[in-house]
């Protein structure tokens, strides 16, 4: 990344120009604990930078606080349902409070893995073949059509919650039942064997991709947040041409969904070198294990600069 590109990522706004900033975190989704960690890290960075910021753990009384507190803008650090799926974005639109990240439509689309895949399939970017599971017969049909191994996913969860790799019909049925406890809609996808990459985007630019390695069967919740043996490769290990191809694919994936502000795109590469899109995260993690801060460091931004850049985009996008 050039020096000019790095400088364009940084916010040039004075901290006080942001006004009073509410950091929204916590919530009631299955990703609450991750959101609490992310939100507290973001809040500390804003306060250390001199921003007039305060935190709201989004619970039963948060709407009253949003209405009663004088809030100039909101920094959304809610992961999963209720915060990353367009509902909070829609509420803030109604209250005329500018906020960070993508808007209502892009947030709702990206949170719905099935709809995201359908958009990508219509526009060309490759994404693994899949099926929707509603009963045991669907599991049997999916096994016949897609073969094994497969990966099972709740359609509206993040952080790999409820996901499982399966190698038989019995395992598939068990994984579908487990995933159904998180979501009424469950997807099963062809397993792509090969290295995994994640590509962060910030203010319209693609950050250095990260190669991921784990001794787990895939990059699951433990590997993301708890394990000490997860490997992160920056540079990502691809040659220049492949890395450029990966970055262009991530940019196309985000453009197709209508992503704004910041995001993170997850991609697999198969044995033939072909890239496959998995999903886009519109409110990625901001913990000490998180990937966007890691990519930002590789681009020359420390955590505080990253947080200010995300917040600055809310000014440009929504006033």
Swiss-Prot record:
Keywords: ATP-binding, Cell shape, Cell wall biogenesis/degradation, Cytoplasm, Ligase, Magnesium, Manganese, Metal-binding, Nucleotide-binding, Peptidoglycan synthesis. GO terms for molecular function: ATP binding; D-alanine-D-alanine ligase activity; metal ion binding. Mg(2+) 1 binds at residues 266, 279. Belongs to the D-alanine--D-alanine ligase family. PANTHER family: D-ALANINE--D-ALANINE LIGASE, D-ALANINE--D-ALANINE LIGASE B. Cell wall formation. This is D-alanine--D-alanine ligase B.
């Amino acid at each position: 990344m050039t020096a000019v590109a790095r400088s364009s990522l940084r916010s040039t706004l004075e901290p006080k120009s942001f006004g009073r900033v509410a950091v929204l975190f916590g919530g009631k989704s299955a990703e609450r604990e991750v959101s609490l960690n992310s939100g507290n890290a973001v809040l500390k960075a804003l306060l250390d930078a001199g921003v007039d910021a305060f935190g709201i753990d989004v619970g039963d009384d948060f709407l009253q606080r949003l209405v009663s507190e004088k809030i100039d803008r909101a920094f959304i650090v809610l992961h999963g349902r209720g915060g990353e799926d367009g509902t909070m974005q829609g509420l803030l639109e109604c209250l005329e409070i500018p906020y960070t990240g993508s808007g209502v439509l892009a947030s709702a689309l990206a949170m719905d893995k099935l709809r995201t895949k359908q958009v990508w399939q219509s526009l060309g970017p490759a994404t693994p073949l899949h099926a929707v599971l509603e009963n045991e017969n669907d599991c049997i049909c999916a096994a016949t059509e897609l073969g094994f191994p497969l990966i099972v996913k709740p359609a509206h969860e993040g952080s790999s919650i409820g996901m499982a790799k399966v190698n038989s019909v019995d395992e598939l049925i068990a994984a579908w039942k487990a995933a159904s406890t998180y979501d009424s809609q469950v997807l099963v996808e062809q397993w792509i064997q090969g290295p995994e990459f994640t590509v962060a985007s910030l203010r319209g630019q693609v950050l250095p991709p990260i190669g991921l390695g784990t001794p787990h069967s895939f990059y699951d919740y433990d590997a993301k947040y708890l394990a000490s043996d997860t490997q992160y490769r920056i540079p990502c290990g691809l040659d220049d041409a492949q890395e450029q191809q990966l970055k262009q694919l991530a940019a196309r994936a985000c453009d197709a969904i209508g992503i704004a502000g910041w995001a993170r795109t997850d991609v697999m590469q198969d044995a033939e070198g072909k890239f496959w899109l998995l999903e886009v995260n519109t409110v990625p993690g901001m913990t000490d294990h998180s990937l966007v801060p890691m990519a930002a460091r590789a681009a020359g931004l420390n955590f505080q600069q990253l947080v200010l850049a995300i917040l600055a985009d809310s000014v440009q996008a929504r006033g």
